Amino acid sequence: CSVRGVAYSTFTVIHLIDNTVAEIMQYDNPCVIMLRDGRNYDYPKTELNIDGKKIYSSSVTLQEGDVFIAMSDGCPHAGIGIAYNFGWKVEEITDFMEAVVPAGYTAKTLSTMLVDECNKLYGFHPGDDATACVVRVRRREPMNILFGPPRNRDDCDRMMSLFFSKEGKHIVCGGTTSSIAAKYLGKTVKTSLSFESSDVPPIAEIEGVDLVTEGVITINRVIEYAKDALGSNELYEKWSLGRDGASMICRLLFEEATDINFYVGRAVNPAHQNPDLPINFNIKMNLVEELSECLKKMGKRIKVSYF
């Protein structure tokens, strides 16, 4: 502590054991908020005295949907003398989180929303460091993405059969790819009339498919959002609220999916050989590899199959 001229440290530890138990150790930070069924949950705490310091220990058996919010004291200090006389109380922070958690945001986005709100309460000039960490307990959710036709046309049925037999939601990316998928399902491709003005191509619809989008331009935008989500996460409002294909893919991959299966065709689309295009689309594989790496960094399990 530079003010008091003494060495000083607080800590909060949330240790997850086998995805079934959370062990929490806390010293001199605001108490970890726990939400269960969307509401504040008063979990048990045991006080330990170590060298005159009060350490609080907890062991919580996890349930699906549990949310843990850890923070530094810069969060409840937000707004002192500006928005609030005595800062943003932990009870008020709890109310704020109870309001946003049911929307299904990722843990990363929830922590971003909390810190952003603190920044606003500080008048965008924080008087203390505001750090937040959110843990969300959820079940595994498989997701499947079909991107590009196979190099060998004879492999179309095999590729489609493997793709559609997988558990979970199904996303089809690309015009030719969607035509092949529709033919396999015995359905037609319908361009959706409900899309917003955007530099991302419009989505389409195929009965039996959860989302149908354009290919390379859309996936490239998803990669841009993924890189931002791994960093400052400043663009989360765009993809979390957008109605374009890239935003919809982001919500499925970033917020819903835990296990993602890519089915990637190696056929070359002549339309993507245009040297005047602003992005090099010649090697579709690069996009898949780049997106896969981003998703792995988000903690997703990734499997890529090429055809």
Describe the role of every protein-language-model region.
Residues L62, V67-E117, P270-L277:
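Active-site-proximal, acidic helix/loop segment immediately C-terminal to a metal-coordinating Asp/Glu
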Residues G174-G175:
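Extended, low-complexity intrinsically disordered regions enriched in serine/proline/glycine/threonine
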Residues D18-V21, Q63-G65, K227-A229:
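Beta-strand-turn-beta hairpins that frame and shape the catalytic cleft
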Residues A7-F11, D42-G81:
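Acidic loop->beta-strand submotif enriched in PP2C/PPM serine/threonine phosphatases
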Residues C1-G38, I55, K108-V135:
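Catalytic core of PPM/PP2C metal-dependent serine/threonine phosphatase domains
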Residues T12-I17, S58-Q63, M159-S165:
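A short acidic-Thr-Gly-centered motif at the start of a beta-strand
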